[in-house]
Amino acid sequence: MSVLREIGIIARALDSIANIEFRDIELARGQYLYLVRIAENPGIIQEELSELLKVDRSTVARSVKKLEAKGLVQKKAAKDNKKNKEWFVTEKGEKLYPFILAENAYSEEASLQGFSQAEVQALEKMLVRVRANITGDWEAVKKGQKRNY
């Protein structure tokens, strides 16, 4: 099996677990990702959220609109550019944040069970490098360019 296949399997398994567990707090598939990033980055705009999560802007727009309809996030016009909408977590959304963080911490601890601290640090460092390696391709393809393979 390839490294990317393993990363994909891990990501899908953890995402599936989270989606099932977050049904209890009325979060639909993948919405926890957006809620957490907005909570961590108050005032984030759609483009920044798109780049942070490596998803297209239309996906971000649909997801935050659903969170807004549930009263978990709210948008405000940016002071410096009225065309930009800044996103903030509401009081209702803030109440879910600790539960999501607890699930994330549990999943990380369970996933890394049996790894030494040095191994965890090395793995994180390598994964950051992998992400850096793909960022250029992601940005190029997002702008309509084709990769040469």
Mark where each language-model region is.
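Charged, amphipathic alpha-helical coiled-coil/dimerization segments
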Residues: 65-128
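N-terminal leader segment of winged-helix/HTH proteins
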Residues: 1-25, 141
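C-terminal regulatory/oligomerization modules of transcriptional regulators
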Residues: 117-149
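Pre-recognition alpha-helix immediately N-terminal to the DNA-recognition helix
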Residues: 13, 17, 33-36, 95, ...
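Residues within helix-turn-helix
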Residues: 46-47, 58, 65, 85
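Short, locally clustered residues in the helix-turn-helix/winged-helix DNA-binding domain
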Residues: 8, 36-40, 101
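The alpha-helix within a helix-turn-helix
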Residues: 50
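Short capping segments at the starts of secondary-structure elements
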Residues: 41-45
